[in-house]
Structures are given as C-alpha cells and as structure tokens.
Amino acid sequence: MSVSALQQRFALARSFNASTKRFSKSARRSVVVRAGTTTSIQFVKGQNETAVPEVRLTRSKDGSNGTAFFIFSDPDVFENGQGDITGMFLTDEEGEMSTVDVNAKFVNGKPTGIEARYVMKTEADWNRFMRFMERYAEDNGLGFSKK
C-alpha cells in the first residue's frame, strides 16, 4: 500500500470517530504476520509481543513534546519465561525507538499487564512516533480517533 493511500485511510479513521484519542483494539487476538510487515513491539529483544495494546496520547499545545501511554492486558512476555523485560522496543523500517519506563501490573501476586510510557521531547520525535503507529495500526488492523 502506498504512503498516500495509507494517509487517506488514516484520515478517514480520524474523521470517523472523534470521541476518543486512542489507538486500540478491545480484544486480544492472534496477530498474523504478513510479508512486508515490519513493525513490532518487544519487551525482550527478539520476542515480538502479539498482545495488541491500548495506546493513549497526550501532546503539548505548542506541539513541542508529547507522551504515549501503552497498556497491555495479559501480554505474551509473561508466558513461558521468555526472559527479563529490559524495556519496550518499537521497531519498524526506520529503526528502533525505546523506553525503559515499563511497569508490570500484578493481581494476587501474578502478572496481568504491562504499562509503558514513551516520551517524545521534540516535534520530530512526535512525527517519528506517529509514523510508527500508522504502520503498526495498519499491520494490526487498528484505528485512530481523536477525543
């Protein structure tokens, strides 16, 4: 799919539902990896996370900085002892973005979720993150809407 077609598709998604400001998919599902799929979220290097997160965005009025909050319910990283969580790594064809601001949620002593925060300190960081999310959303059948 061309970049302009992807931008048009996202423009439609943005204008369709203006009640929330989230990339999200309500149910956990299997992610089908297609040829050409280049986006991934990882907590352990080399282990793609298949649980699709809810993502909430905030941005300053002048656009100089912003924050993305990722909420993963029952992520794969807790299954089969895949390794220690060393951060959250957002990888696509442009490279990798990462954060170490990652917290596990526990209920009755068992891990049930992960919350991560990715801070964007410049407008260029924001634009780069949005390009990643557009690709990730396309690969995982997500939509975007503003609140």
Curated annotation (Swiss-Prot):
Pfam families, sorted: Psb28
Compartments reported by the entry: Plastid, Chloroplast thylakoid membrane
Entry annotated with the keyword Membrane: yes
GO CC terms, sorted: chloroplast thylakoid membrane; photosystem II oxygen evolving complex
Gene3D superfamilies assigned to the protein according to its UniProt record, in alphabetical order: Photosystem II Psb28
Keywords: Chloroplast, Membrane, Photosynthesis, Photosystem II, Plastid, Thylakoid, Transit peptide
Residues annotated as transit peptide in the record: 1-34
Membrane topology: Peripheral membrane protein
Main location: plastid
UniProt record, GO biological process: photosynthesis
Similarity remark: Belongs to the Psb28 family.
Subunit-level organization: Part of the photosystem II complex.
Name of this chain's protein: Photosystem II reaction center psb28 protein, chloroplastic
Gene field: psb28
